[in-house]
């Protein structure tokens, strides 16, 4: 097999290109119930993984409690991040990094990603809706043909 796009448990791995010679295109969801997409990402010989609190959570007394726990406190994360998406050559690392950057939070996660030249997309939840922030490495991937 010379080309394929494989999905396992929400993570995707692209090998080669589509039959028409173009990269595989993968949509990044807006983390709400709308089913809308924030953007489409071209993938060629890379993996993509997203970690967020918009699918697995409970709400109590108006607060959202995610399935991801903060390692220092053992409590559910409490930050403004709705999701983090990472593109990386290794699928397992993309998945682990997406979770780790989410645990760090928007500011510290973006700082870590920029220092390590990681392609990461942060979607933050705010009063006016969602805000999308991409690291320089992620933005560069969007500009590729």
Where are these regions (language model features)?
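Mature catalytic core of soluble alpha/beta enzymes
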Residues: 1-145
